[in-house]
A protein has these predicted regions:
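N-terminal transmembrane-helix/juxtamembrane module of multi-pass inner/ER membrane proteins
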Residues: 16-94, 141-146, 150
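Membrane-interface loops
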Residues: 58-74, 102-188
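Membrane-embedded alpha-helical segments of multi-pass membrane proteins
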Residues: 86-93, 166-173, 216-217
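Short hydrophobic alpha-helices at membrane interfaces in multi-pass membrane enzymes
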Residues: 185-198
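N-terminal amphipathic/basic-hydrophobic helices that include classical n-h-c signal peptides
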Residues: 1-17
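Interfacial helix-loop-helix junctions of multi-pass membrane proteins
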Residues: 140, 159-162, 199-217
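Hydrophobic, membrane-inserted alpha-helices
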Residues: 93-97, 172-176, 196-202
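Aromatic-anchored segments of alpha-helical transmembrane domains
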Residues: 52-53, 120-126, 195-205
Length: 217
């Protein structure tokens, strides 16, 4: 995983150095938001809307019954603290692809954002109509760095609204975006992005953040 991450960062650095952005965002003004040059930025408004709705569902909605998500396979999957690394890398994985497409491939940015808008909105509707949770987290033992980091993750992230998994959806949004970009269509790139998406998806069940059902959903 570390070698793969280094390769991704090294390649991304070379790409950023070699290419100039398609649009000079220093020229952006709110008055120009509806112009052909900048109107794709309106898609970014989804993020604060999603965050507000998700925050409400997590912290402020009236008390409801949360259906526990579990299946027999969950109990065969051991907890593995090492998976906190790809789990945390998800934020860079998704954010990095959004930034890359925003600067260097506007059509791919639009398609990735619409994929996220549709799938994340579906997830929010599911959380609203079918409140769900998981009770799979183990008692953490030990004081090493990875265990402490996982403990902080557990403390910051509730065990509710887990199916479908936003981590899995976001990971494959990046993979599909990579397939959509000519620079990343080489077999090595596609395999790298797919491997990372699968690792992040696996991390959700090995960290006991999600049931296998959440991943499949």
């Amino acid at each position: 995983f570390i070698l793969l991450t280094r390769r991704v960062f090294s390649a991304a650095e070379r790409i950023l150095i070699m290419k100039l952005p398609l649009i000079d965002y220093r020229q952006f003004r709110l008055s120009r938001l509806n112009t052909p040059q900048f109107r794709h930025l309106k898609l970014l408004l989804f993020w604060p809307i999603f965050s507000l709705v998700f925050c409400y569902l997590e912290n402020y909605r009236p008390t409801v019954y949360y259906a526990p998500m579990r299946c027999a396979l969950d109990h065969w999957i051991p907890f593995c603290k090492w998976f906190v690394i790809p789990y945390a890398f998800w934020f860079l994985f998704v954010g990095g692809m959004l930034l890359y497409t925003l600067f260097y491939n506007i059509p791919a940015f639009r398609r990735m954002m619409w994929f996220i808008i549709l799938t994340y909105s579906f997830a929010l509707v599911t959380y609203l109509l079918f409140p769900n949770c998981q009770h799979l987290r183990p008692t953490l033992l030990g004081g090493d760095l990875l265990t402490r980091f996982t403990a902080k993750l557990y403390a910051a992230d509730t065990n509710t609204n887990v199916c479908p998994s936003i981590h899995v959806i976001g990971s494959f949004a990046v993979y599909f975006a990579a397939r959509d970009i000519r620079r990343f269509r080489a077999k090595g790139w596609r395999l790298g992005f797919l491997t990372m998406a699968v690792l992040i998806s696996l991390s959700t069940v090995f960290l006991k953040q999600h049931s296998v059902l959440d991943v499949l959903a």
